[in-house]
Amino acid sequence: MFVNQRTRRPYMSVFVLVLGAAVICPAYGIIDRLVVQTSSGPIRGRSTMVQGREVHVFNGVPFAKPPVDSLRFKKPVPAEPWHGVLDATRLPPSCIQERYEYFPGFAGEEMWNPNTNVSEDCLYLNIWVPTKTRLRHGRGLNFGSNDYFQDDDDFQRQHQSKGGLAMLVWIYGGGFMSGTSTLDIYNAEILAAVGNVIVASMQYRVGAFGFLYLAPYINGYEEDAPGNMGMWDQALAIRWLKENAKAFGGDPDLITLFGESAGGSSVSLHLLSPVTRGLSKRGILQSGTLNAPWSHMTAEKALQIAEGLIDDCNCNLTMLKESPSTVMQCMRNVDAKTISVQQWNSYSGILGFPSAPTIDGVFMTADPMTMLREANLEGIDILVGSNRDEGTYFLLYDFIDYFEKDAATSLPRDKFLEIMNTIFNKASEPEREAIIFQYTGWESGNDGYQNQHQVGRAVGDHFFICPTNEFALGLTERGASVHYYYFTHRTSTSLWGEWMGVLHGDEVEYIFGQPMNASLQYRQRERDLSRRMVLSVSEFARTGNPALEGEHWPLYTRENPIFFIFNAEGEDDLRGEKYGRGPMATSCAFWNDFLPRLRAWSVPSKSPCNLLEQMSIASVSSTMPIVVMVVLVLIPLCAWWWAIKKNKTPPHPQVILETRAFMH
């Protein structure tokens, strides 16, 4: 026996090398269909039958050297080529991270925790390749039955380019602090089989291991802790997949990046970054875009967090300026578990994760909207989307003393105000008052359950839906073709309380085809919805348009911000329509248009009443929600400002609340 030092996997020496040559060399008269010759070396996967179709699966394919010892906190280094056939039949380790254990034994939480051992040696790929078994075209599918296949070549001819199959590359979420491609929910066998696409996923470093930023202290960007190492991991994985697409029967020009939450944000950065721009011309952004408040950070903030971690790890922060190499050697000697735990000391409240893509001037050259405004996205296709109740999951975790997982909570008005002020504590007082105005349930009086619902709405709108809308519109204005979906289906098998609605991440299982797994207890309509979403995503990967045969799915534009509704019942609370505008048009007009104008009034000498003059007639007429906000928010603020100007005691914020209530 010998051990491959790169993979640490044992092999029989001479016998396996000879057999490895035989299975891939026609001269021996033996062809092993499960062996693929990659640029790094040959790999052997496994075969599985899925939905009546054979899929070849390759797990644990290394694309980088293990980022351990001297490579900790550095950009990834490509994997050394190996000799002999690498065993690619086992799931790889997950990158170092902490588990969520707020609800021990609860499957709804456990499904997102790593299901393989965590390790710093974690930079591996997973790849699913459908064989040429023929899948019926979506146009002919009999929804409501399990007869998905037909014995002809139509589907294969229509859904494979001359260069090969389209490839979907998955990037997992987890707030850049957690996540792993090995989760059961990310098993892409069904997506590959039903969609007739190659699917790949990668591991990338999260937390401080992937985002520690000390560039100002280090001479030369290639040195320790340049920041964004996790993004460089993703970039190297994408390049490896593009280089090896043909080896798996794929088309290197038909690579679509798709991801959820932090994964969606990552996709949006790859489309804009000078490092990765051009590697893919299509992206799917699920509940995450780069401009979201949690999705990026300034170099100054990242540096402050890094300094705090060094101090918490007892690595003599005072020496960082004069001897950064000494400090970094200390950090490399710190136990990985210690770093993994101590980094959470910098968590700053709801969605205030201490790691995120950093504006380093190299991978991320400017703030997200500036990068977007400077981009030329002609020829880029985007599918973007949100879920109806994005905020409830995070609300529960950050305010676990207020809410229960299983049952709705009647939240008194004083607790509503307390939570809202805590969530938006970095906003100015006028901004916080405006936010409270916007999310007070005026129609329902002092309804505690409505208060809980409105706090969840505020979190979802601010951190997810409205940044997504803003980014989607920015993409269209830079030349991209954008389609928008809105996922509104509450899954019948959901383990979370009814009050939590359609949670952040609920669409993932449908896109990966999990409801089509007969062993799981989904309803037939949910299986149909999943199949429909799988086909839309696959069609988008091939053509850039998610619409199926005979279906109209309009482009998303500022003039017509139309989204397509994904719901198993074929209808939604939006009057049973398949389409809507927005989503959350009024709330997002507040966050994306009104609040920035209010924020511009940053000093007492500047009247908020001037905001009326700043708003063009065209702007106000095209967004009626702004008019409502002017009446319900700006007029009371004007009164407050005039009171200050006349040296009178300004009205208490509660008086302003009562003013709006009266006006309403």
UniProtKB/Swiss-Prot annotation:
Cystine bridges: 95-122, 315-330, 466-588
Topology relative to the membrane: Lipid-anchor; GPI-anchor
Subcellular location: Synapse; Cell membrane
GO BP: acetylcholine catabolic process in synaptic cleft; choline metabolic process
Glycosylation-annotated residues: 117, 316, 517
Enzyme class: hydrolase
Any GO MF annotation of the entry: acetylcholinesterase activity
SUPFAM superfamilies reported for this sequence: alpha/beta-Hydrolases (SSF53474)
Record's catalysed reaction(s): acetylcholine + H2O = choline + acetate + H(+)
Its EC number(s): 3.1.1.7
Pfam families listed in its UniProt record: COesterase
Record propeptide residues: 648-664
Lipid group attachment sites (GPI-anchor amidated asparagine): 647
InterPro entries, per the entry: AB_hydrolase_fold, AChE-related_enzymes, Acylcholinesterase_insect, CarbesteraseB, Carboxylesterase_B_AS, Carboxylesterase_B_CS, Cholinesterase
GO cellular component annotations of the record: extracellular space; plasma membrane; side of membrane; synapse; synaptic cleft
Catalytic residues (positions): 261, 390, 504
PANTHER family per UniProt: ACETYLCHOLINESTERASE (PTHR43918:SF13)
Quaternary data: Homodimer; disulfide-linked.
Task performed by this protein: Rapidly hydrolyzes choline released into the synapse. It can hydrolyze butyrylthiocholine.
Protein name: Acetylcholinesterase
